[in-house]
């Protein structure tokens, strides 16, 4: 086992804080409408220009092991916020840096780290409850467009296109983002169906940059049983090899020899294939398989209706224009089923909804109906260059996550105002001692940090802006986009409640743990072995007699 270096107390905390600051300072320049871009070097291709906090955070690795630990913990804050709400990563990073900085000052002054953490936790619990009270429903298309605009760094065209997409496929509909061919953004609404089952083996992936499987004009085989013997699939695979088209297998499960053979055939390029489990369980699975069959114009191969997999032909398979499979979801776009049959199936499900007495069953039936009758909206991002395309696509994806979060939990005034208003209402949280009280104060000060950073990035004096906003009430705040004060909701500056809540919770959780650090352990850097010295020249050989 390699030797380790251990640092204690203040030495450890100073190193950790240095790492936190390096990462947070790189991320926080992107915050707000006047935030700057960060350029990321790539080992291949052109550099990536981004204003997305989590993209910047993920690129940072520091040479010093102890500083790197601090940076990695803040990176975790950004990643968690991104996973939970899809946005708010920069806000979370700024909050974490503020809590760690203030917390470590208090620890250096002799306060108890555990009590400080308890105080911070109490303040955050109260703040989250207060955020829910402050939250308003995000019901209309205008509010959705405003949320999308703010998340896409004040790009109104992105906010508008997302609002239109949600209007067309419904708030629960499936919206995907793709790279377009034009200079402008375009919206395509395609009939399609998505269900929550991903690929059965990562070896099916053919788009490594997105970690997904994409099949163009595939056949779709639907089987209501487990497939473990490859012999059952041979007739279909042989027929398929002649057509040169890909195949999507949707079955109860594909395992053992069958899965291994499919993977090998796929990797060798003999047959382009992907397999996923059928959605749902029991009777619901049978019904959902039938939905997919009607959508794609195929037949469900089930022994209970006298159909055997070995005797199946290409006529039994459904077809679709495109299938996209990720780790968690499968989307079938433009199935070639007959419209009359799809409409009949939708009206049949409507009838079942009316007759059902169970709320759970009704919800599941409505989901099925939306998938059959709704569709998939595809936002095609337009740009002049590949570098701009990547940057714009990341912003559209962020905006989409933010609007979904807004529909889910509502919206609060944006621009850091919500946290300022919440902080003013929770100053008297009940605590057990003075150190816990200081923990609450640390959390309250940190809640000002996002607004201060937005003002700093806009070239304003942060303290002046923060005081002006604190002296106001309700939705009164600072619009950094045009350097004015006013009602944030009227100016269309909204943040999803879920994004603000997640940012605060994850920042406090990880920053609180960092404050309580007393020792750090890391491997010693390996000393490079010296190069071998040059070998002396060989002496000449004596003349031979």
From Swiss-Prot:
Q: Name one GO molecular function term.
A: unfolded protein binding
Primary subcellular site in the record, as a coarse category: cytoplasm
Which GO CC annotations does the UniProt entry carry?
GroEL-GroES complex
EC annotation? 5.6.1.7
Does the keyword field hold Lipid metabolism? no
The listed locations are:
Cytoplasm
Which Pfam families does this chain map to?
Cpn60_TCP1
Q: Where does ATP bind?
A: 30-33, 51, 87-91, 415, 495
* PROSITE patterns from the UniProt entry: CHAPERONINS_CPN60
- Keyword terms: ATP-binding, Chaperone, Cytoplasm, Isomerase, Nucleotide-binding
EC top class, in one word? isomerase
* Keyword Isomerase attributed: yes
Q: Which reaction does it catalyse?
A: ATP + H2O + a folded polypeptide = ADP + phosphate + an unfolded polypeptide
Cystine pairings recorded for this chain:
none
> What InterPro entries is this protein classified in?
Chaperonin_Cpn60_CS, Cpn60/GroEL, Cpn60/GroEL/TCP-1, GroEL-like_apical_dom_sf, GROEL-like_equatorial_sf, TCP-1-like_intermed_sf
* GO BP terms: chaperone cofactor-dependent protein refolding; protein refolding; response to heat
Looking up SUPFAM superfamilies in the UniProt record yields: GroEL apical domain-like, GroEL equatorial domain-like, GroEL-intermediate domain like
> What PANTHER family does the annotation carry?
60 KDA HEAT SHOCK PROTEIN, MITOCHONDRIAL
What is the documented function of this protein? Together with its co-chaperonin GroES, plays an essential role in assisting protein folding. The GroEL-GroES system forms a nano-cage that allows encapsulation of the non-native substrate proteins and provides a physical environment optimized to promote and accelerate protein folding.
Q: Which family does it belong to?
A: Belongs to the chaperonin (HSP60) family.
> Which NCBIfam families does the UniProt record give?
GroEL, PRK00013.1, PRK12849.1, PRK12850.1, PRK12851.1
Question: Subunit info?
Answer: Forms a cylinder of 14 subunits composed of two heptameric rings stacked back-to-back. Interacts with the co-chaperonin GroES.
- The name under which this protein is listed is Chaperonin GroEL
This protein's encoding gene: groEL
